[in-house]
Amino acid sequence: MFCFPRTGGRIAVWLIGHSFIHRARRRAAVKKPGLQLGFPEGKVGVHWFGVRGMRWPGVWSTLLQKVKAGRRPDILVIHAGGNDMGLVPQKDLVTAMKNDLDRIRRMFPDIVIVWSEMVPRLVWRHARDGQRIERSRGKVNKLLAAFVRKFNGVVVRHKVLEEKLPGYYWKDGVHLSDVGTDLFNLALGEGIERALGRFDGGSWQA
């Protein structure tokens, strides 16, 4: 696999994930601080790649598609895996996630990866036992968080959403409401800010 060196100019922040990212972008477009999540456009470029229904393998394929178009991220935010719960054995899912994160790091040795943990759902569509899936979600999050931190990545916990208040969700019990999405975007912004602090010694603020 080729390594792609960073080009000059703005720090490129990419957000890749399933419908949560798709809906988060749509919400950010109509609510302050906007699609840039409050970061200065002159120094940071925030790019959203949300694909509804995306399962974990889509992270790698989406990344490759964008890279082949001549672009590359400096900071990569990933929110995916939730649509695989109940369909892929936990061990297999964790292995696939770790392997892909390693591939990404080989492609971009200087990248900062931000792992956005899977948030709870009131309804798990592919599960006979929702509580069992919730326990598995917690285990996967814990394992991936530890893995990402080993290579100085950033973990976004979404602690407020762990309260699972009905008002945080859309009527389907899967997707987040406007309130829930605002909280989701706030946490993503905080995670990106931490990643920027590790990038170029925080020179983006200068």
Sequence positions of predicted segments:
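Serine-esterase "nucleophile elbow" of acetyl-processing enzymes
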Residues: 1-52, 65-68
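Alpha-helical cap/lid subdomain in secreted, periplasmic
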Residues: 32-45, 54, 60-206
